[in-house]
C-alpha cells in the first residue's frame, strides 16, 4: 500500500493507492521479470505523488539490485519530462498533473505522445475538441537491463474510460 496524503476524515472518501507486483520466472535463470502495475495519487497538493513515487522507485531499485528485470507501468498522474510538448497544460486547467522527476542513472521512462493517454471529464468526448484538456500521464519506468523496442498509445478515443491504453514492447538485456 502506498502512502496516503490525506488525513482523517478526508482519507475515508479517497482511493487507497497501491502497487500490484507480478513476478515472472526467467527460464534457466534465478532472475525474474518483475512487473509493477500502478495508479498514483491524482487529487493531492503534490506531496502524495512525490511520496508514492519515492516509494515506487525504492521498490524498483531493490528488485533491480537482486538482478531482476523491472518494468513499472500505469497511471502516474504526473507528466513525463517533456511530456507536455504535444498536449500543453492550459492556463487555469481544472486539473494539473505533477511532473515526474529524474530517474537514477541507467533507468528510463517510456511513453508515447502520438495520442493522449488521458482526458479531463469536463464534457462528453469529441475528437479534437478544444474545450477539454488532454494529458500524457500513462507510461512506464524501465530498469537499466530492459530496453524499449516500442511504446504505443492506442487511440481508443476514450470509448470506455478517460484513459487510452499504452502498449510497451521491451527486450531484456544482460
Place the predicted regions along the sequence by residue:
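Short proline/glycine-enriched turn/loop segments at secondary-structure junctions
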Residues: 10-11, 125-131, 155-159
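Solvent-exposed loop/turn segments connecting transmembrane beta-strands
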Residues: 45-48, 158-164
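Structured beta-strand-rich core segments of catalytic domains in phosphoester-bond hydrolases
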Residues: 1-32, 40
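Metal-dependent phosphoesterases centered on the DNase I-like endonuclease/exonuclease/phosphatase
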Residues: 34, 44-147
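Active-site metal-binding loops of divalent metal-dependent hydrolases
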Residues: 38-40, 74-76, 164
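Residues that flank catalytic or metal-binding motifs in active/ligand-binding sites
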Residues: 15-20, 31, 36, 133-137, ...
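Low-complexity, intrinsically disordered Gly/Pro/Thr-rich segments
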Residues: 145-156
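Active-site beta-strand termini and strand-to-loop segments that position acidic
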Residues: 21-28, 142-144, 161, 168-173
Amino acid at each position: 500500500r502506498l502512502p496516503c496524503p490525506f488525513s482523517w476524515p478526508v482519507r475515508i472518501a479517497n482511493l487507497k493507492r497501491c502497487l500490484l507486483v507480478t513476478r515472472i520466472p526467467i527460464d534457466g535463470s534465478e532472475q525474474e521479470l518483475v512487473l509493477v502495475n500502478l495508479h498514483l495519487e491524482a487529487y493531492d497538493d503534490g506531496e502524495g505523488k512525490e511520496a508514492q513515487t519515492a516509494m515506487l522507485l525504492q521498490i524498483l531499485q531493490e528488485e533491480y539490485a537482486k538482478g531482476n528485470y523491472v518494468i513499472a507501468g500505469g497511471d502516474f498522474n504526473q507528466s513525463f519530462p517533456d511530456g507536455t510538448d504535444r498536449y500543453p497544460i492550459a492556463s487555469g486547467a481544472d486539473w494539473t498533473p505533477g511532473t515526474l522527476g529524474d530517474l537514477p542513472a541507467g533507468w528510463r521512462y517510456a511513453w508515447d505522445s502520438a495520442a493522449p493517454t488521458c482526458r479531463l471529464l469536463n464534457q462528453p468526448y469529441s475528437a479534437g475538441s478544444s474545450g477539454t484538456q488532454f494529458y500524457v500521464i500513462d507510461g512506464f519506468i524501465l530498469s537499466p537491463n530492459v530496453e524499449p523496442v516500442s511504446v504505443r498509445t492506442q487511440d481508443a478515443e476514450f470509448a470506455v474510460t478517460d484513459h487510452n491504453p499504452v502498449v510497451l514492447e521491451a527486450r531484456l538485456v544482460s
